[in-house]
Amino acid sequence: MDKKFIRNFSIIAHIDHGKSTLSDRIIEFTNTLSKREMTNQILDSMDIERERGITIKLNAVQIKYHARDNNEYLIHLIDTPGHVDFTYEVSRSLAACEGAILVVDAAQGIEAQTLSNVYLALENNLEIVPTINKIDLPSADPERVKKEIEDVIGLDTSDIPLISAKTGLNIQDVLEAIIKHVPPPLDANDDAKLQALIFDSFYDSYKGVVCLVRIKQGTIKVGDKIRMMANNKDYIVSELGIRTPKIVNKTELVAGEVGWVAAAIKTVKDINVGDTITHANNPADKPLPGYKKILPMVYCGLYPIDTSQYDDLKEAMAKISLSDAALTYEYETSQALGFGIRCGFLGLLHMDVIRERIAREFNIELILTAPSVIYKIELTNNQEISIDSPAKMPEPTNIKAIKEPFVKLAIITPDNYVGAIMELCQSRRGSYQDLEVIDGTRRRLIYKMPLAEIMYSFFDSLKSITKGYATMDYELIGYQAEKLVKIDIMLNGNKVDALSIIAHRDFAYGKSKIICERLKEVIPKHQFEIPIQASIGSKIIARETIKAVRKDVIAKCYGGDVSRKKKLLEQQKEGKKRLKAIGNVDVPQDAFVKVLSEN
């Protein structure tokens, strides 16, 4: 096929602006799938994606479209996630394209992640085609949104498609805009040395790891000996093809095409997303510009509530990590919770999705320890180490400084909530950077804030004070030294490692008090008094006491000498003292679940 009839594009948007629904309508309009084969969110392959109405894994399909100019075009569509946690998925798909459709909600207008995705597209030199969706809503105001797109992003909206992905209104206008504005891959040459960009991978129990690729140059065929340029590993191509979104086998993929390649690769860890595939016997001179290695932002310990399921949890993590390149994990033990796994996630939604997949696909209920970020510790001997858990914190005497990650936080909000949001950000150690006007009623607030503060229910608080109208987006900007301390929680004088946290010194007392109070509520009474203490080093900063259960030892004394009663009470007192010295505090699992889930 002549390269001028090929188009490669992504759909980008803020979460819930209708990307996946638009993908459905395009697939339906072009008869890529029959009516019987169509389901809602056809490109969202996981049940969790369909139930939550979000896209987590990106997906790619090949579509044939007979345009108004009477030519048939080969269009490769890549659907992308919209949530901030999965920005890395968006950046991967954009590198495989020449253009992007920017979907904007006709009622909501431009939101936080609309802008961050636009910047990603511009970084990849993509042609952006704006599209206004949901024009069938009673609250839709396409003219206002057009003005926003022109003023805030600077895109021309004179011939912008106005569509309803839900009803299928004006879907052909989107396809025509793609043909008109997205450039074809004219520099692609079938006879050049092979350069194929891996923009995603997934695990298939029969094929092994399947790579989703964009063939930039050259041709790849079944039986070819290929090489991964990042690690110089060689494989033989066993199968390849395209997705429609059904898996369709082919004998070759040529320059300009988007498809999949299987080569008996054992695990996803053998594949670097962003790597370049070339021929082993005639390799390309240099790899394509790849991606940055994905680094987890949030760490958390996962422990099975039923400790006998630890081996099942190990197996579950191994299987899930086969198809999730961003998930990292290592085994750990806790004196309080037993054997578990410490995992690195892209963000809290990613963490929640993994927890739900383990519960649903493997029937394992989990306790999650308090999420933590990566701290950089400067030691007194001038070494620098990174820790992802309070348990790994060195002794205070060995620490020169503790640095924590900071983010640039952008919040788009109706102007009547600006004051409340500024108060929230300041209470979370945020420092004000900028305030931009988007239109007559909406503002964009920029704050610099510690990542750790965003993790603890910040998004819930933001939604609560703005009645759900504010949207946010953040990006990591670096590390900064802060007055941070490790808070240990002790029960009856013994440290409980699972409850340790790292906090700012100014907020340490408040957080400690809350944890101690919650523990007092959930730990049952024992026959001896239990002190619950929070400490920084050897200094106790908060305390609660669980009173002892009193057994009435003098109930059997009817009258008689008072010294008899005193003797029995004295014996009880001695017994309790002995019990307190040697007795272990029995903390039920649900107490940990309650304290950690609310922490």
Curated annotation (Swiss-Prot):
PROSITE patterns registered for this protein in UniProt: G_TR_1, G_TR_2
Enzyme Commission designation: 3.6.5.n1
Residue numbers binding GTP: 16-21, 133-136
KW Cell membrane (keyword) present: yes
Subcellular location: Cell membrane
Catalytic activity: GTP + H2O = GDP + phosphate + H(+)
GO biological process: positive regulation of translation
Membrane topology: Peripheral membrane protein
Domain tr-type G: 4-186
Primary subcellular site in the record, as a coarse category: membrane
Keywords: Cell membrane, GTP-binding, Hydrolase, Membrane, Nucleotide-binding, Protein biosynthesis
GO CC annotations on file: plasma membrane
Keyword presence, 4Fe-4S: no
InterPro entries assigned: EF-4, EFG_III/V, EFG_V-like, EFTu-like_2, G_TR_CS, LepA_C_sf, LepA_CTD, LepA_IV
GO molecular function: GTP binding; GTPase activity; ribosome binding; translation elongation factor activity
Role of this protein: Required for accurate and efficient protein synthesis under certain stress conditions. May act as a fidelity factor of the translation reaction, by catalyzing a one-codon backward translocation of tRNAs on improperly translocated ribosomes. Back-translocation proceeds from a post-translocation (POST) complex to a pre-translocation (PRE) complex, thus giving elongation factor G a second chance to translocate the tRNAs correctly. Binds to ribosomes in a GTP-dependent manner.
HAMAP family registered for this protein in UniProt: LepA
Recorded family membership: Belongs to the TRAFAC class translation factor GTPase superfamily. Classic translation factor GTPase family. LepA subfamily.
Protein name: Elongation factor 4
Lineage: Bacteria, Bacillati, Mycoplasmatota, Mycoplasmoidales, Mycoplasmoidaceae
